[in-house]
């Protein structure tokens, strides 16, 4: 058994950092050591920022984004085309699409995908909120931007079924060859999707 080299407070910091996606135990130890060595410049301001975030962060009641205001910054942006809603699995997907800045639309965060094996059904996701938004009118297009997994496909089909009969165009993100991608390195599923979604040039 490894000997303890720090007090319980630093051990707790390491354990909590290790729970952050992308940080394993070793990375968490390095991050914790870096933080405590730069206590005034990093640890103090980080603790303060995290405390403030803990007090102020809310889930947007309209789209499901995280922000310090409700409705969120995205939903209150008057320059957005609110007749187009991009449906995403998670807030991280919303942020990724915003970085691309390709479509100045509204968003709707589902909070995951349908997964019967994991016990995740329609009531566990923000699907009813989406159906209600479309039912209110004013939405001409729904862009379903979920991952190209079995669960993502199942979720997309379920949403399409729920919106049947409503006057809304439903589209999906194109799947296929990434920009700068070489065909030899792509899997068969990606190549098949790319061939089926081919466009005229």
Curated annotation (Swiss-Prot):
One Pfam family matching this protein: Toprim_4
Alphabetized CDD domains for the sequence: TOPRIM_recR (cd01025)
GO terms of molecular function: DNA binding; zinc ion binding
Record keyword Lipid metabolism present: no
Gene3D superfamilies attached to this UniProt entry: 3.40.1360.10, 6.10.250.240, RecR Domain 1 (1.10.8.420)
InterPro entries assigned to the protein according to its UniProt record, in alphabetical order: DNA_Rcmb_RecR (IPR000093), Rcmb_RecR (IPR023627), Rcmb_RecR_Znf (IPR015967), TOPRIM_dom (IPR006171), TOPRIM_RecR (IPR034137)
Keywords annotated in UniProt: DNA damage, DNA recombination, DNA repair, Metal-binding, Zinc, Zinc-finger
Zinc fingers typed C4-type, residue spans: 60-75
Listed HAMAP family: RecR
Function field: May play a role in DNA repair. It seems to be involved in an RecBC-independent recombinational process of DNA repair. It may act with RecF and RecO.
NCBIfam families linked: recR (TIGR00615)
Name used for this protein in its record: Recombination protein RecR
Organism of provenance: Sinorhizobium fredii (strain NBRC 101917 / NGR234)
Name of the coding gene: recR
């Amino acid at each position: 058994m490894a000997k303890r080299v720090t007090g319980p407070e630093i051990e707790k910091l390491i354990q909590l950092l290790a729970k952050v996606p992308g940080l394993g135990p070793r990375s968490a130890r390095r991050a914790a050591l870096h933080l405590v060595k730069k206590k005034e410049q990093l640890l103090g301001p980080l603790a303060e920022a995290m405390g403030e975030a803990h007090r102020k962060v809310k889930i947007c009641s309209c789209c499901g984004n995280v922000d310090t205001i409700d409705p969120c910054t995205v939903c209150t942006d008057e320059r957005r085309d609110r007749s187009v809603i991009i449906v995403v699995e998670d807030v991280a997907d919303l942020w990724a699409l915003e970085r691309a800045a390709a479509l100045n639309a509204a968003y709707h965060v589902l909070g995951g995908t349908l997964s019967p094996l994991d016990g995740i059904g329609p009531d566990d996701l923000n699907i009813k909120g989406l159906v209600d938004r479309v039912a209110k009118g004013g939405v001409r297009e729904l862009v379903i931007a979920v991952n190209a997994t079995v669960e993502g496909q199942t979720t997309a089909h379920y949403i399409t079924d729920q919106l049947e009969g409503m006057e809304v165009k439903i589209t999906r993100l194109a799947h296929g060859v990434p920009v700068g991608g070489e065909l030899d390195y792509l899997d068969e599923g990606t190549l098949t999707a790319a061939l089926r979604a081919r466009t005229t040039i």
